[in-house]
Amino acid sequence: MNMIRFITIPDFADYQVTLKLMEDYVNKVISDHEPEIIYLVEHSEVYTAGTNYKQEELLNYGDIPVIYTGRGGKFTFHGPGQRVIYPILNLASPNRHKDLKLYIKMLEEWIINSLNYFGIKAYIIKDKVGIWAKVRKDEFAKIAAIGVRVRKWVTYHGVAINISTDLSKFSGIIPCGLENSLITSLNQLGIHVEMSEFDKIIQTEFNKIFK
């Protein structure tokens, strides 16, 4: 098995610059010029809209830029304290499957297992996209968002996990189109972890799921 490289982009990355980087690399993977890769990013503040967005779900964005992307999903927020993971994987390669639903299920399992390592019980909730953590009895809050795109069976975009994110920024949108849904982070759940430590665990857990 070839180990996939994880590349950490330094500082707070501009979303549009990162999107261009992803798209260029996807083209290289499609052309068999480059191997699979996973980018680890912490963005400067930005609201992004997926292909299923509704404009009324953008409530009050203030001076935070809004970017309309080609990923699946609706509005979300990216900013400091959030680990964004962009796997660029070739689902057409012999060791993978041309199955987008399976890929998303594997992403979910990967993130759930990574959160479990830190003592956070995370869940998938029917008809609600993303990864959810229990915050009170029978009450759940979203801790990670998922939005992907595939071109010629090569994946891009990915997952955003709230580590120490300023959760007040989510009030400028209806996150993922889910009205009245709570948003949480590792910090809010009492788990204080350095981004570098979190990255080590997601790399370990990735290799258990994406063999």
Curated annotation (Swiss-Prot):
Q: What are the GO MF terms of this UniProt record?
A: lipoyl(octanoyl) transferase activity
Q: Where in the cell is it found?
A: Cytoplasm
Regions that span the bilayer: none
InterPro entries assigned to the protein according to its UniProt record, in alphabetical order: aa-tRNA-synth_II/BPL/LPL, BPL_LPL_catalytic, Octanoyltransferase, Octanoyltransferase_CS
Tell me which Pfam families the record gives. LplA-B_cat
Q: Which of UniProt's keywords are assigned here? A: Acyltransferase, Cytoplasm, Transferase
Q: Where is this site: Lowers pKa of active site Cys?
A: 142
Q: Where is the active site?
A: 176
Top-level EC class: transferase
In the record, the note on similarity to other proteins reads: Belongs to the LipB family.
State the HAMAP family in the record: LipB
The cross-references to NCBIfam families, in alphabetical order and at most eight, read: lipB, PRK14341.1, PRK14345.1
Give the protein's recorded name: Octanoyltransferase
